[in-house]
Amino acid sequence: MRVLKPFSRGTQITVGGVVGVALVAGMVYTSPSRPAVAAAWNSVTKSDATPWVGAWGAAVQPPVAGNEDSGQNWSTEGFRNQTVRQVVRVSAGGTRMRVRLSNVFGTRPLRVDGATVGRSAGGALVWPDSLQKVTFGGAAGTVIPPGREAVSDAVPLSTSPLERLTVNLRFTGATGPATFHRFALGSTYRADGDHLSDISADAFGASTDSWYFLSGIDVDSGQADRRTVVFLGDSLVDGVGTTPGADRRLPDGLAERLAVPRPARPFGVVNAGVGTGKLLRDSACGGQSGVGRFERDVLDRPGVRAVIVHLGANDIGAPQMDDPCVRPNPEVSAAELIDGHRRLIRAAHAHGIKAIGVTILPMKGALFPIWDPDAEKARQDVNRWMRTSGEYDAVLDADRVMADPADPQRPRPGYVFMDGLHPNDAGALAIAAALGLDDL
């Protein structure tokens, strides 16, 4: 049994029957016409063997106003008398699915008055006859306390690997500032009033490229074992530099490799990357540090078999930047970063999860000031430790994939985005191809 700390990082609330989870505190159910209230618990029992697979996920962040690098979003204003339509691509298929919602960074109870899910027909369109109601403890809606998360009942909607789904959430009252994921690389749509049952896009005239309250989709694989792979990382994992709407992030590349029928590896891939995220310290735009969110973003996912970690680049580069998004930004030594990685490895191994390290990418030549000789030395020291210590169960050497043969401190020209730092589509695909599937 793993005992959760008192809500400091957000506690998962499960509403309805969930395999492998036992409620310790009581759950309050109401009639289907009224929302179920997700009550707190203080401990859970988790089973290693579960049919649920994490098929999609997002690392949630505190609300923050948009800026020039991420565009505008609706997190600070929240929603009132609106329907929010979000389109995501699942990495694994199953006979049923369920939805995870988060109010981890909310300041008030989040009342979700209704939810539906269906197959995306492109943009805000939904395939006819595919919409299904999502319930919570048999009720049409739920109330999620601040600092908590909720998991829906199982929905009888079958899914296929790499299929796009549409999740619709209805908010009647004001939500307050929204727990969200800032850099979605995909569109979320908003309509005034109740449009949970609409298959057309007519009412959804406003859009943004962030996700709101939606933190995960699980599918029932029908096989009781561990089949979830989680990427924990920064903008490399989040997909900065790849084509918006094209699902070309590093985790997407792995999901596509795993979905190839021969040999099929029916694993789900969850993306827990956060642009500007750090390993050791929280930041204004990156939210919680990697060590601070490891429990929620990795351990609380169902059936996790491996975690793949790329963190530390922003810890190294932030001291050179005068950007409020990355503050606080004190200098961090390689020894401190290695200690942080060791904490993640220990936490993973304590739960029987493989830990795979990803070497930090080349940083020289970026359009923003993140590189100097001291930063390069710290990067090289961390990468050398990853390659030689044997402390990670395996290493994905993204540094060597991305390095320019003519100057290994810089990224390879054909693999880098126009900002001179982040992998483009080709670079992300090359890194995904370098991971040994037998290491998972």
Each predicted region: which residue ranges?
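Conserved SGNH/GDSL esterase-like catalytic core that processes O-acyl groups on lipids
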Residues: 56, 80-86, 109, 115-123, ...
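N-terminal secretory targeting modules
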Residues: 2-232, 242-244
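Proline-centered loop/turn at the N-terminus of a beta-strand
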Residues: 268, 354-356, 394
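Active-site segments of SGNH/GDSL-like serine hydrolases
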Residues: 310-315, 344-379
